[in-house]
Regions:
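Active-site segment of metal-dependent pyrophosphate-handling enzymes
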Residues: 146, 249-251, 301-339
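Conserved hydrophobic/aromatic beta-strand scaffold that supports enzyme active sites
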Residues: 218, 252, 266, 328-332, ...
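N-terminal strand-loop-strand
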Residues: 229-280, 309
């Protein structure tokens, strides 16, 4: 296997003939191979915007159902803007990266207040909305407003890095500076052709020029692709090496109000931060040399100001976030004394298991709820 040469800072310009050939072959390939997806059937800016946000961190197969349900629940930008944030997060529940939902909601409110509820048509106004970067704005402009704009999401960066054998880390801003002009150079001027080209470029990255095992045998760009010519598909794109991901043990309380085990205490996470605006079972990080039951009791005293009895361990749940991993150690707990105060959360609520379905929880917490629901007669002996 050949290794990449030192990072190239500039690219050899593509001739008009090569550009034309790349456009034509990619669009023809897309017409024959592009998947039929609901957001490709519409030019509605709101629907296109929603799909682009949902697709930022999530696979197409997962997005389709969420996309339909979200549009059914919030059929217009104004209906989204007017909804409480809790309802928006509930619709987003399970899709992850919840800042996307919070930003979508904030942006809808800005559109309602500044643009009379109509999605803006000026590129500068689009890119000024929360949660919309240059590439997402480019996609919305191209797909909904028929304004050809280049795109540069993760899939597109990978395809372009291979096409031109760009051997600089694709996460770096300096690499994007090389790639933006390339994406723009390849884009046709005609709005309809630009729609097809950008859709095709995304499709190529998602289904053919994949991160692992790209299927070069059916790629329309094989003849021009420098990575293919030099057998560098496995080396490109170059990524910045990630630091080892830290792991935290988290003590979590399923905290019952009394021995009838009807109501449980849940906490609303702070707005700004990981999983902001979602509800959770309270708890926190274990300190060095601390037992897990002691961690749960301490966290509840520090964050809620009440004394509890910590009982048996119910379950252990492992979960990975982008920058760290956690193991949730979940304990059956009973309220003892004190007045619950939301010292580290926005709000606290005693709820029954049935009532929990009205609140949005992170995925790992939903697994705790599933466990509790599947064991309705769970009667554990408190220590
Ligand atoms: S030939 Fe292979 S590596 Fe090159 S763009 Fe096509 S799928 Fe990607």
């Amino acid at each position: 296997m050949k290794s990449p040469s030192p990072p190239n800072k500039t690219l050899t310009p593509l001739s008009a003939k090569v550009v034309q050939s790349l456009r034509q072959s990619l669009i023809a390939w897309f017409k024959a191979n592009g998947r039929s997806l609901p957001w490709r059937e519409t030019r509605q800016p709101y629907a296109v915007w929603l799909s682009e946000i949902m697709l930022q961190q999530t696979q197409v197969n997962t997005v389709v159902d969420y996309y339909h349900r979200f549009l059914a629940r919030f059929p217009s930008i104004v209906s989204l803007a007017d909804a409480p944030q809790a309802d928006v997060l509930k619709q987003w529940e399970g899709l992850g990266y919840y800042s996307r939902a919070r930003n979508l909601h904030k942006a809808a409110q800005l559109i309602r207040d500044r643009h009379h509820g109509v999605f803006p048509t000026q590129f500068d106004d689009i890119v000024a909305l929360p949660g919309i970067g240059q590439s997402t704005a480019g996609a919305i402009a191209t797909f909904a407003l028929m304004q050809p704009r280049p795109i540069l999401d993760g899939n597109v960066k990978r395809v372009l890095a291979r096409l031109m054998a760009i051997d600089a880390p694709i996460q770096e801003a300096t690499t994007a500076k090389i790639m933006w002009p390339l994406s723009a150079r390849l884009l046709p001027d005609d709005p309809e052709a630009a729609w097809q080209f950008n859709q095709a470029l995304m499709e190529l990255g998602a289904t053919c020029c994949t991160l692992k095992n790209p299927d070069c045998s059916r790629c329309p760009w094989q003849k021009t692709c420098q990575a293919y010519a030099r057998n560098l598909q496995g080396e490109l794109p170059v990524s910045v090496k990630r630091k080892p991901v830290p792991h935290h043990d988290i003590g979590v309380a399923v905290l019952w109000k009394d021995e009838t085990r009807q109501q449980c205490l849940i906490a609303l996470r702070p707005q700004d931060g990981l999983l902001g605006g979602l509800w959770e079972f309270p708890g926190g990080k274990r300190e060095a040399d601390e037992t897990l039951p002691a961690c749960v009791a301490r966290e509840i005293m520090e964050e809620i100001g009440i004394e509890i009895a910590v009982g048996a361990k119910l379950t252990e749940i492992k979960h990975a976030y982008t920058h760290f991993k956690v193991t949730l150690h979940v304990y059956d707990c009973l309220y003892v004394s004190g007045i619950p105060q939301p010292k580290a959360s926005q709000a606290l609520q005693w709820v029954t298991l049935d009532e929990m379905s009205a609140y949005a929880f992170p995925k790992a917490n939903n697994r705790i709820i599933d466990l509790l629901k599947s064991n309705p007669a769970m009667q554990l002996t408190l220590c």
